[in-house]
């Protein structure tokens, strides 16, 4: 399971749009406590912005492709790139828009 140690610092100041978020285990039922259920791609919603009044974030689960709405405070934060598992990298290629994929590859050193 992922925790705060694998996340970027100061999540309250970060824009979540297009980022891989770590869902808090406290939000999940115990039977879903797994990395596959914890990693979500933030796509849109007022909750992506750290300064917006709205808290909703529309997301896709990297483990199974489920799309749903979570609140910003349901997440621990943004996963650091070095902790992104290979299975999640593959899922990102499938769910990200092309411009998001290019931007992420540039940030990760052109993987």
Question: Where do the protein language model's features map onto the residues?
Answer:
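Mixed-charge, Lys/Arg-rich low-complexity intrinsically disordered regions
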Residues: 1-29
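Acidic, low-complexity, intrinsically disordered interaction modules
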Residues: 25-85
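Long, compositionally biased low-complexity segments enriched in polar/charged residues
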Residues: 7, 23, 78-82, 88, ...
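A subset of signal/propeptide-processing and intrinsically disordered low-complexity segments
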Residues: 10-13, 76, 100
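Non-Sec secretion/translocation targeting segments of pathogen effectors
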Residues: 98-111
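Charge-dense, intrinsically disordered terminal/linker segments
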Residues: 59, 94, 102-104
